[in-house]
Amino acid sequence: GGIITDKEAVKLLKAGQSVLGIYPANIFEGFIGGEQYTFWNGVYFYLLPIIAVLPFGTSFFEDEDSGYLKNIYIKKKKEIYLVCKFIVTFISGGIAAGLPYIFSFMMNLLYVPAIKPNQLARHNFVNQLNNMSDWYYEKPFLYFGVYLLIIMLCGGVFATLSLCVSFAAKNSLFVMFFPFLFNISFDYVAMELKIEKYVPSNIMNPMMTEYIKGRSMFSVFTEIFAAILLCFGFFVVLNKKRERIV
């Protein structure tokens, strides 16, 4: 995340105005969540599942693989441990996923003015047909704040998704990369089925609203919370009743 943020900062030093040269760059159009003219935006959102897993995503597998989990179950109720593990993993994944976004925005504040985006400047591809385009041009702080919340919630989902496969994994690498592989596979299948509006990478990216055109924010948050409940139920209920399969 830090490397990506640094790359964005270097780019900002070289770009101080729009493509047409008639409107200055602003804090919302140069950071990693608000630009589309380099590949770093795509890199961040595709690597986000791995970033989210790094803090505690593999901790359940490691506790069980080392035998330490048995000692925990002796001292604490199994249900309490599983719920606490899920909550901690979810929160840590959300924070890890959102930090590059936040740091990039903060670094952007050092170089460019805090003015509202202008559609005629052609800094991005957000137009009046995209979701929340009125927020983007009139209330940009609110617009990117909502997307930060979406990013953190999705980061939590990716982190807890790694918990859901821990009981059947043979090594921690599979646990770490499973959310990434799942996201890539889902992206490919959704593209083939023409349902890109449900892909997490498109839902999280503030510059990809064209792919979720027609969806309300209520439906987006409903999808995210449904995924949270599904991961919670699968992880807690399954591990409450059985030990590792392999």
Predicted regions and their residues:
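Amphipathic cytosolic juxtamembrane alpha-helices at the membrane-cytosol interface
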Residues: K76-V88
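Junction motif at the cytosolic side of a transmembrane helix
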Residues: C164, F225-V246
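Transmembrane helix boundary and interhelical loop/hinge segments in multi-pass membrane proteins
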Residues: L54-I74, K78
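Secretory targeting signals
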Residues: G1-F61, F86-A159, L163, N205-A226
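Short loop-to-helix capping motifs
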Residues: G1, K76-K78, K170-S172
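Residue-level recognition of pore/gate-forming positions within transmembrane alpha-helices
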Residues: T89, F180-I184, I228
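Central hydrophobic cores of alpha-helical transmembrane segments
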Residues: S172-F186, N202-I203
